[in-house]
Amino acid sequence: MSCCGGNCGCGSGCKCVGCGGCKMYPDLSFSGETTTTETLVLGVAPAMNSQFEASGETFVAENDACKCGSDCKCNPCTCK
């Protein structure tokens, strides 16, 4: 069964999650079986001030350099 009807997207840790991603279609076979649909709700929260802003820690976006490739697996390429 393909993830999100083939529209998988990369999430945190370069794991394939969600829909509306890179539009890869790893599984185009139809067997007539009943499938279960999952819904992933993503949201945006307001920025929060923190007393640790100047602590010297650096944060890197986990999804910066990956995209969903064949078989809904993440590849280390940027999806544009």
Swiss-Prot record:
Taxonomic source organism: Brassica juncea (Indian mustard)
GO molecular function, one term: metal ion binding
Pfam families for this protein: Metallothio_2
Name recorded for this polypeptide: Metallothionein-like protein type 2, MT2-4/MT2-25
InterPro entries in alphabetical order: Metalthion_15p
Coiled-coil positions: none
Record's function text: Metallothioneins have a high content of cysteine residues that bind various heavy metals.
Disulfide bond annotation, renumbered to this chain: none
UniProt record similarity statement: Belongs to the metallothionein superfamily. Type 15 family.
